[in-house]
């Protein structure tokens, strides 16, 4: 574990901000579990007054940093087009997102598949391989949550930094190596470690993600605790939390309600309990030394960009009303900062899914990586609609015969025989923001083949 020296800090960073309320308060007698903190700082331990914003500012202007590519955009986009585009999807788009192949009618969601942030990340990673054909290239995490794309990069010789017992082994990275930061971003501790190793950093972080980082840095500057709507183990949320000051991560409206009930002393719905139980519940989802009696007086909202839009908005409204009730409407601006960090691409795909479930379809096929948060929420919308919805990560989940292995929104793996009804069918189709069109086509081709065999057997 490296610790930033005073000399390095003075050379790179601006003077530390004035002491926060955390520095002024006495230490709490109850401490949160340190496991979350250790996962955030697996690569380096940073001093409390380390100016993360200034460090990031300086890093992005250094000679060993690139986030715009290397001048190979045209040829890498052509290669991606060859590998990931689909004639089936092209036909659907040319026919108003609906087309019939034999007994199968497919209705494609208006917004689906690769978002511009994902396409940008993959394209820059391809550029890095072309720019550094003979150098070792590492990824701090999967570039995106799609097994097809990740396997392609692996075949190109791009390696993931190894993980041992949940801790990344940065010792394998040497000076002169190339390290790609994925679309989800990377924790500031990881960036610091890589900068110290003098590697070439290729940053593919989605601009929407870095927008959330700016928001939590704003919270920190104003001495607000960041309430982050996300999954505490998700790469994006880990990175966002690393840029925050004091934070708590809530996965859903139920956890947000628990926090708000605690703020109101049990007067919301009575779901919360003692301070000790609060800290036990959120032991992996709070900043080190988090004290709910002190750190929930001034709060701001941020989110993992791939979470369900409606739930993020609901959480924001709930927290705002809670602070109004606790401190008075006239004082709410001193205790609450609203948010505007919902990703456009996530919102568009969710809105399109809400429209798709209103269509007359027999079932919905959701295609995307099983560790993809945004895809899980598309499946969630399908399940809530009552329409049979099947979330697969590749065409290999279909078959043999009329059988499918799919995941439910909450993660359960299910196998189902005869999932396709007999006779003519209409299928609604969508895909996650990390899913290439070719992966969707491959899945649909499996569906077409099952129905073709059905017709032949009936003849």
Swiss-Prot record:
Keywords: 4Fe-4S, Chloroplast, Iron, Iron-sulfur, Isoprene biosynthesis, Metal-binding, Oxidoreductase, Plastid, Transit peptide. InterPro entries: LytB/IspH. (2E)-4-hydroxy-3-methylbut-2-enyl diphosphate binds at residues 145, 234, 305, 372-374, 434. This is 4-hydroxy-3-methylbut-2-enyl diphosphate reductase, chloroplastic. Its main location: plastid. The keyword Zinc does not apply. One of its GO terms (cellular component) is chloroplast stroma. It is an enzyme of class 1 (oxidoreductase). Enzyme of the plastid non-mevalonate pathway for isoprenoid biosynthesis that converts 1-hydroxy-2-methyl-2-(E)-butenyl 4-diphosphate into isopentenyl diphosphate (IPP) and dimethylallyl diphosphate (DMAPP). Is essential for chloroplast development. Pathway: Isoprenoid biosynthesis; dimethylallyl diphosphate biosynthesis; dimethylallyl diphosphate from (2E)-4-hydroxy-3-methylbutenyl diphosphate: step 1/1; Isoprenoid biosynthesis; isopentenyl diphosphate biosynthesis via DXP pathway; isopentenyl diphosphate from 1-deoxy-D-xylulose 5-phosphate: step 6/6. NCBIfam families: ispH_lytB, PRK13371.1. It is found in: Plastid, Chloroplast stroma. It comes from Oryza sativa subsp. japonica (Rice). Belongs to the IspH family. Its cofactor is [4Fe-4S] cluster. The lineage of its organism: Eukaryota, Viridiplantae, Streptophyta, Embryophyta, Tracheophyta. Homodimer. [4Fe-4S] cluster binds at residues 115, 206, 343.
């Amino acid at each position: 574990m490296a610790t930033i020296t005073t000399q390095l800090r003075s050379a790179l960073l601006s003077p530390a901000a004035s002491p926060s309320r955390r520095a002024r308060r006495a230490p709490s007698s109850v401490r949160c579990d340190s496991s979350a903190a250790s996962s955030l700082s697996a690569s380096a331990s940073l001093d409390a007054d380390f100016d993360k914003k200034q460090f990031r500012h300086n890093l992005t202007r250094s000679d060993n940093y690139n986030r715009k590519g290397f001048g190979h955009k045209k040829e890498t986009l052509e290669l991606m087009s060859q590998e990931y585009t689909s004639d089936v999807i092209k036909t659907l788009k040319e026919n108003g997102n609906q087309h019939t192949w034999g007994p199968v009618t497919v209705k494609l969601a208006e917004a689906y598949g690769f978002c511009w942030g994902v396409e940008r990340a993959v394209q820059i990673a391809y550029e890095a391989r072309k720019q550094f054909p003979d150098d070792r290239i590492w990824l701090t995490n999967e570039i995106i949550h799609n097994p097809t794309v990740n396997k392609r990069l692996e075949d190109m010789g791009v390696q993931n930094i190894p993980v041992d017992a949940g801790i990344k082994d940065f010792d394998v990275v040497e000076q002169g190596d190339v390290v790609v930061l994925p679309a989800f971003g990377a924790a500031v501790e990881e960036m610091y470690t890589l900068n110290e190793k003098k590697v070439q950093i290729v940053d593919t972080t989605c601009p929407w993600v870095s927008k959330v980082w700016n928001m939590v840095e704003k919270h920190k500057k104003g001495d607000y605790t960041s309430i982050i709507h996300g999954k505490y183990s998700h790469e994006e949320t880990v990175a966002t939390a690393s840029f925050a000051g004091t934070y708590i991560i809530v996965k859903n409206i139920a956890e947000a309600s628990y926090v708000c009930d605690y703020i109101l002393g049990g007067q919301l719905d009575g779901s919360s309990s003692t301070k000790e139980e609060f800290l036990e519940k959120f032991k992996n989802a709070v900043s080190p030394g988090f004290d709910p009696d002190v750190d929930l007086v001034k709060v701001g909202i941020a989110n993992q960009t791939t979470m369900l839009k409606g739930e993020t908005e609901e959480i924001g409204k709930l927290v705002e009303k809670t602070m109004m009730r606790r401190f008075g409407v006239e004082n709410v601006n001193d205790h609450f900062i609203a948010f505007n960090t919902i990703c456009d691409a996530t919102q568009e795909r969710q809105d399109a899914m809400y429209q798709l479930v209103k269509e007359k379809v027999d079932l919905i096929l959701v295609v995307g990586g099983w560790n993809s948060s945004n895809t899980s929420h598309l499946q969630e919308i399908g399940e809530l609609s009552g329409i049979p919805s099947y979330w697969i990560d590749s065409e290999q989940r279909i078959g043999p015969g009329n059988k499918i292995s799919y995941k439910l929104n909450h993660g359960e793996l299910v196998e189902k025989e005869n999932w396709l009804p007999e006779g003519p069918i209409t299928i609604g189709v969508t895909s996650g923001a990390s899913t290439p069109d070719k992966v969707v086509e491959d899945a649909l081709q499996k569906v077409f083949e099952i129905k073709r065999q059905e017709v032949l057997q009936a003849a």
